[in-house]
Amino acid sequence: MSWVENMKNQENISRIVELIGQRAGNIFTARGYCCSETVIVVINQGFRGDLSPELAVRLGSGFCHGMGGAGCICGSLAGAEVALSLFLGPRQHGGMKSKEFEKVAKEMHDRFRARFSATCCRVLLKRRKEKNGATCKELTVGGAEIAAQLLLEQRPELAAKVDLEFLGARESKLGTLAKKLLGRE
């Protein structure tokens, strides 16, 4: 690959990661999903995964608020790990070998910690209350962005599968409420 092609590829990857983050922030706010639910939905739909949106949400529900309110691992990080597993996990066609995937999963953890200085929901929320930490929305955006970056580093061909229509769409709380009332969601 030439230097110019490499630069274009990097710009494309950066744009996809940015769109993933924006869509995660939008869905977190508009649909009222928790962090883990949002990350799984956005990565799955953004990269045209094979889970239905409903199943993607259900998979993330137990990780909300640091494992069901326990305050342990941040749901955004847990959701990102699940999302990476959907595309890279070893027990699927085309998945990575277990040891290779473990390195990617650890890298997700390490990048999240480097960006937000912690991985524990309780610690992250305490920092937020002290006014020097990220909001849950910011953690959700960050978790989705890091997962997308890692996914594209491992499987760059996924850039061609990205659902730009889904990633570019924007919803509002009012629109989401109207869909629920009309039975369209």
Region spans (language model):
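A short glycine/serine-rich beta->alpha loop
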Residues: 22-30, 63-71, 127-132
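Acidic-glycine-rich active-site phosphate/pyrophosphate-binding loop
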Residues: 5-16, 43-62, 114-121
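C-terminal binding/interaction regions
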Residues: 101-181
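Active-site-proximal helix-loop elements at catalytic-domain edges
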Residues: 20-49
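Short alpha-helical scaffolding segments that buttress acidic/His motifs in well-ordered protein cores
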Residues: 24, 39, 59-64, 143
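DPxDG-like acidic metal-binding loop motif
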Residues: 78-87
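Phosphate-handling active-site elements
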Residues: 46-58, 86-103
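Polybasic, low-complexity association/targeting segments
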Residues: 2-31
